[in-house]
Every structure is written in C-alpha cells, then in structure tokens.
Amino acid sequence: MCKSLRYCFSHCLYLAMTRLEEVNREVNMHSSVRYLGYLARINLLVAICLGLYVRWEKTANSLILVIFILGLFVLGIASILYYYFSMEAASLSLSNLWFGFLLGLLCFLDNSSFKNDVKEESTKYLLLTSIVLRILCSLVERISGYVRHRPTLLTTVEFLELVGFAIASTTMLVEKSLSVILLVVALAMLIIDLRMKSFLAIPNLVIFAVLLFFSSLETPKNPIAFACFFICLITDPFLDIYFSGLSVTERWKPFLYRGRICRRLSVVFAGMIELTFFILSAFKLRDTHLWYFVIPGFSIFGIFWMICHIIFLLTLWGFHTKLNDCHKVYFTHRTDYNSLDRIMASKGMRHFCLISEQLVFFSLLATAILGAVSWQPTNGIFLSMFLIVLPLESMAHGLFHELGNCLGGTSVGYAIVIPTNFCSPDGQPTLLPPEHVQELNLRSTGMLNAIQRFFAYHMIETYGCDYSTSGLSFDTLHSKLKAFLELRTVDGPRHDTYILYYSGHTHGTGEWALAGGDTLRLDTLIEWWREKNGSFCSRLIIVLDSENSTPWVKEVRKINDQYIAVQGAELIKTVDIEEADPPQLGDFTKDWVEYNCNSSNNICWTEKGRTVKAVYGVSKRWSDYTLHLPTGSDVAKHWMLHFPRITYPLVHLANWLCGLNLFWICKTCFRCLKRLKMSWFLPTVLDTGQGFKLVKS
C-alpha cells in the first residue's frame, strides 16, 4: 500500500516538474525577448542623457539642464505610477511622450562645435546600438510569435512619441518648426500607409527616406538621432508587411467601422490638404528664372491636377455613400453571420473599388507631375506637404486596390463525411463495432454542423453535405464531384472559388478510401477540375480532416497550371493520455471553423503541445490569382453615373492609359516576389480573400 502511494506521489511530482520545466522554458524565452526590448529602451535613455549632458557642458545653457532634470523627474514619476499604483497606461504614455521630446531636443540642439568630442561620439554609438537592438527585438518577437497583431492606424506609443518630437521642434524658428511638424505628420501618414500594406507603401518609404535629409527640410543638427527616431518608429509597421496575418478588412477596420460623420470629415480634411499642397505648388510661379517653363507647365498640369482631384474627392465621397448603405444593413442584421466585407460584396463594392483604383491612380500621377513641375528644393514646407499628400493618396489607392481584389468573389461548397476510421488488413474501410457507433455519429454530426456553420457564416453557396456510414463508391463520388465542379452562378459564369471538404479514411499516400476497394487520388480530382474549369480562372480549395492529408499538401505544390490549395490536418500520434486526450477526426474541423468564424477566438496554431496541427499547401500559380476586371464600357458607365459631364473626356484617357499597363514591369516583379514568398517563405496564415484563412502550425 505504501509502495503504491509512494509510486503515485512520485509519478505526479514528476509530471508536475516536467510541466513546470516546459512552462519555464517558454516563459524564459518570452522574458528574454522582453528584456531585449528593455535593454534597447535603457540604451536609448542613456544615449539621450549623455547627449544632453554634453550639450549642457559645452554650451553652458541652463535651460538644457532644467529640461534634462525635468525629464528625469517625469520618468521617475512614470516609474512610480507603474510600480506602486499599477497605472500602466498613464505611466507608459508619460514616458513615451518624454522619450519623443528628449530625443527631439537631442536632434535639434546644435552640436557643430563639439562634433568630435569623445562623449558626443559615444552618444552616436549608443544611438546606433539602440537602432540595432530595436530592430533585433522586433524581429525576434515576430519570428517567435509573441506579437498579436490588432487592427490600428497608429499605436499609442507611436502617436505620443511623434507628438513629443513635434513639441521639441518648437525650440526652432516658426518656419523651421512648422516644416518639422508637417514632416512629423508625413511620418505618421507613412506609418499608417505601411501598416495598411498599401500597394505603393514601399516606394513611398524610399521617397521619404531620400527626401528626409534635404537641407530644405530643416533636418536636425544630429542626423544619427533623427535616424534613430525614424527607424525605431518605422521598424514595426515595416516588418508587419510580412508578419501580419490580418486580412484587408481587419487592417482597415479602424477606418471602415468609423462613424459616418468622422468618415465624411476625413474627406473634407483630405480636400483641405490637397488644396494646401496646390497653393504651395503655386509659389513656384514666383520663380522668374525659368518663367517660360514654369508658367505653361503649371497652367497645363495644374488644370489636369484640379480635374483629377475633383474626381478623387468625388470618388471618396461616393465610396462613403456606399459604405453608409452597407453599415445600415450591417447594424440591422448584426445578430446574423453577416460581416461587413460580405455585405460590401453583396452591394457591388468590388466593382466600384476596381474602377476607383484606376481613377485614384490619375490623382497620384497628377500629384507626381505637379510636384516635379513646381519643385521647390528651398521650401521645406512644400516638401513636407508633398510627403503628406503622397501617402494619403497611396492609402486611398491601396484601399481600393485591396478591396477590389478581395471583395465580391462568389463561392460554392460541398462537404463529404465518411465516418469509417477503422480498416481491414487489406486497407478497406469497415464499419465500426456497435459500441462505438453512437460516439462516432455524435462526432460526425458535430463535423457536419461545424462545416455548415462555416458555409453559412462566409455566405458560401452550399451544394450539399453528404454523410455516409457505409462509404461512397467511386462512380457515385465521380458523379457528385463532377456536378459540383460544373456549378455556375445564377447569372451564368462560373463561381470564383470552389470549396471541397472531406473527412474520412485515407491511405498512407493520401488517397481517399472508398467503398468497394476503390480510391480517389489527387491527380484524378485535378483532372476532373481541369475538365470542368477549362479556360476559366476559378480556384479550388480542398479542406481535409483526415489522418493522411500531408501527402496531398506536398503534391499540390507541384501543380503549375491551376489555382488549387489544400488545407490539411496533422494528428499527433504519440500523446500522453494523462495530459491530453488523443486527437480524433473532427478536432481539426472544430478548431479551424472556430478560428475562421469567431474573431475573438483564442486558438493559437503555433502553440506548443497541440495534438492537432494544421498544414497547407498551394499550387505554384496561386499568388497570381485575380478576379474579373471591369471593361472600358464598365468604366464609362461608372463615370456617367458618378461624375459631372465636364470630366467625361477623361474617360477615353483613362481607358487608353489603363490599356497601356504602365506597371507591367512592377506587376511582373511583384508576381515573382509573391511566388518566391509562397514557395520559400510560406506564411503561417494565408488570407484567401473569401473571409476565411488557411493556416499552418
């Protein structure tokens, strides 16, 4: 008896200590990354303190000493609020504001008389070290999966540091200070542009970096400190271009779900910014040196700019009008499974966005031409406004581009559930023993309910959900799948996406085990798909909840003439039954549907110790997939419906310019990069554009 108790006690203690070691390993890794961030912050604080001390020592300016002591006092208050009163938000807000302010002072105070001082050189090296540590910390956080991306335009940290930096610029003359404040606004717009993954965000970043160190922009006296401020703010949104798995509507949620008045005011605000840029561009007319070039050029391209931006503002206004209609439906049926993106698709928003993308491109082109014609290298305010307008129009272009690519795709789904997960020695599925039938029926019913919920939530037309305890014959499955693959919409064309779900017994090679000893190979299914799809550009997504889905996931990556994806499950075979139940068919379906139908889920596919893992693969051309684009007649009808008659001549120009395909080189390079990413750096979460995502552990 004592031996049994001693054995049970020692066994439980061993399990507890093993689990504690695993938790400690995970916590230690997370803590190490967090401490790396603290180290970067402390290193930056030391650099700021040393830099301000050098400036006070060399200039004997008592104001620097007062501000320096006040800054340390404020940081001390922030620490007290954090550790003794648990006021984390107030503490972090106060410290971030002062970090931005003190770093701004370090930038703007003149250091020309002591550039070669040892302490000043040490400050520069500390700032460079802070840049390296900040980039390393952000990269490790994202690689380790410790960052949970949330939809936001600007984080509180970014906003407060930008405000603090702008306040520090008031130590300069009014004109120089205004130039820097506008530059800070441009940096905020660039951060939002990157976080939204706009199509032209990277070119905007390059342009901003090139123009940043123009003398006319009143670049601070300490370019290293300015580079530290710039890079530390840009690092997170730049890395999130790859690491963020948020869909288009999730990224734009702070804007799309904003109230009607706020969105209308944003259009008015955008119009004021555009008008200010045009007025500043007109200052070029004072240049009498090249009057024979400036006056005709500004007259011609200024008129072109005005017409394009009238269209630009009307396009934004029309977009918000249609979005308001979508909001009415959304808030009326919030209890249903109708999300805003699906409502926008049903309201024809995709067609509107595809045409608007072309129109906003004209605005970008007109802004670039007008900026080149009225270039003022000695006017810092003009250049700052130019850097504000570019990301603003880039975001509008990116919004229409991405919504046009992800909205409006029709889809149809078919589910097959064969609850026969026991095999005879020759590999044929056999019926389960009677004592397991009830349990299996409950599990299979749960799978059917889950997949039907998935179809209903994402507004996927349901062809059928077949459930067969005795299995399906090859001929029966052949007729059903062929009928499914040749389905068309009510209007006549094929659906954009076909979703096939299968849960049942498979062989080790991934083949579906059918009744009568038959099997269904992936090659056979692809041949049926080619036969029915023909020259159309529809997609096929196969979702497998089976024990041997990995072979199909690997095999689909070799297909190069179709748009096909396979989402599979991987069941861990060796599981400690005292810690977790062994995985069963249906567990993956339950988690995957919950992940795609509940935005507040807590499912982490990369979590250690998962008994059911996800794996997916896509064909080589998957990233090239695009929906139907509007024709020239579609653009003409849209123009006549939304814009004044005076702008009609631009219809022919729009059709002609879009027909030139000016970005064919960029699109080709972008397509190659996307193919490279999908083949070598397959993302953990892949947005299908239909509202749901493919995932891998």
From Swiss-Prot:
Its main location: nucleus. Glycans are attached at N111, N533, N598. This is Transmembrane protein 168. It is found in: Nucleus membrane. CDD domains: TMEM168. InterPro entries: TMEM168. GO terms for biological process: regulation of ubiquitin-dependent protein catabolic process. Belongs to the TMEM168 family. The chain crosses the membrane at residues 36-56, 63-83, 89-109, 172-192, 199-219, 223-243, 265-285, 293-313, 352-372, 380-400, 646-666. PANTHER family: TRANSMEMBRANE PROTEIN 168. It comes from the Eukaryota. Plays a key role in maintaining the cardiac electrical stability by modulating cell surface expression of SCN5A. May play a role in the modulation of anxiety behavior by regulating GABAergic neuronal system in the nucleus accumbens. It is a multi-pass membrane protein. Keywords: Glycoprotein, Membrane, Nucleus, Transmembrane, Transmembrane helix. Induction: Overexpressed in glioblastoma multiforme (GBM) patients. GO terms for molecular function: sodium channel regulator activity.
